[in-house]
Amino acid sequence: SLVSAEGPEVQKPNVVFILTDDQAPWALGLSGHPHADTPHLDKLFKQGMWLKKSYVVTPVCSPSRTSLMTSRYGSELGVTDWIHPRNEPDLGLNPKTVTWTEAMQSAGYRTGLVGKWHLGVPEKFHPTKTGFDYFMGFRTGGNKVIRPTLEVNGKDQQVDGYTYDILTDDALRFIDRNKDRAFLLCLHYRAPHTAWLPQPDSDRKPFEKLDPKIPNPDFPNLDIERVKRMTRDYLGSVKGIDRNVGRVLKHLDQLQLAENTIVVFTSDHGYSMGHNGIWHKGNGHWALKPAPSVTNPNIPRNQRPNMYDNSIFVPTAIRWPGKIAPNSTLDLPVANLDWYPTLLNLTDVPLPKGETIRGRDITPALMGKEIVWPDVCYGEYSTHHQSKTHMRMIRTTNWKLVRDFLNPERDELFDLKNDPAESRNVIAEKKNAGVVRELHTQILARMKAVKDPVLKKIKP
């Protein structure tokens, strides 16, 4: 709380930051999906500002979370793919970085993380060493959908119930304990990541007999029945997320905290479900029968690493009653890097001195000011588990260039104006040579700006 010159206390706004895992922008009723059932999310997105071009700079768990916490690229901090707890036991978020949660903690916020961490298992990477007073959840990337093993009060224990319900129960208790002071709650669900089953009847039943429409039914060799089955299961998981977000919002209403609470909803990356013949995210898998034959040892069978829009874009909204206009939208690109400076500005917390901040403070746009910045998205993904790549991407209004500096035969150019579904790679067409040169120059400039280690591997 702050004491103003006039005397009375001005309560700082609370922050509830909800992060899902593997949720695509299309997995939202409001997006026009024919089957997604998300009434609570649809309502939240209308109560504040819907960020329609919200994206992540790396479309996989750990690097995306690194960028969210630090406003830096994963390549700058040595986290370039999902952290494998067995093969990479000593990898995590560099404790020397100052996260935005640490800045809020230093400013007097009571901070809690409930749910998935995936930024290092050893004690030196523990969430309570990275700006959280309280942690309940799991440090690794995965967990069971039901009866998960969670860290509760510092000890691992198996907890009865569905994981998303258990995490929400704990989040509500955190809010209850801190309702009389300024708090930051980060609620990181693992859903709708696989595994999707089992699900409570309330989430599963509406989709059980559904014959879903799928995006690319005519894709050659697409395993249509499998894609339909996965779509049903995925939508049930999304419904479970929606139901639980509704519980959190209702709780804020009941405690009369909604007016003074900034609520952010977003995801760690997007997802494909049959789109372009694949399922999954940036480390995509073919959903074909049979999978294409292997032509490159770096890209094993069934793997389709990518930087598709469905992988990088995420469903995102921010609500702050009385400050951010309801039913508002923002059509300019907003990266996960941008939350760090933006949330600190919104809560009047100073930026930590000496920290490198790559993100843009989008506060003026949230407050309705007419403000414009370039319609450009830049991303990076060096896969090293399921495949081996060095993908770097630049996306403008009309074009997307994806360079794979390890496997140049995989380079892609998409004409987004005429082919928004990214179905045709037009990099070989002579008329596009100038576009490729220009975008390639932009990629190299971005790489140099962040001292990307892959620069050393590029042949001049």
What residue spans do the PLM features occupy?
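Residues forming the ATP-binding cleft of Hanks-type serine/threonine protein kinase domains
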Residues: 417
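Formylglycine-dependent sulfatase
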Residues: 1-405, 409-412, 420-448, 452-460
